[in-house]
């Protein structure tokens, strides 16, 4: 992706996948916008195929425990854990995005809606995921700073 100039977009994809707990991202699950005349790749396609995000198979409130059994059984397909992947992909832009997403709440729809308990549980999971990513990033940043200071 770096050769195509899409490194930032790929990083953003993995960070967003972590926040929404997308269990179905894999090497064949993203796309490109291609110029039909030249067949040149112009950009990454907007993110799509999130039907395995937001814990779709969790049926009971107990399954929404952060890092619990559901997470072990329905984790990411790339890597073992969303958090380290997201931390490795953080940039100033994605870090700011996560900070701005703190406190996110779903907008309820009058006709198409999930039960209130589920929406609240999903909001909590997303908040916990954001906090875990940012906390791990803070630890990682401190470790890097300490290592650099040790060399001086």
Identify the role of each PLM range.
Residues 1-22, 26-27, 31-152:
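Anionic ligand-binding catalytic core segments
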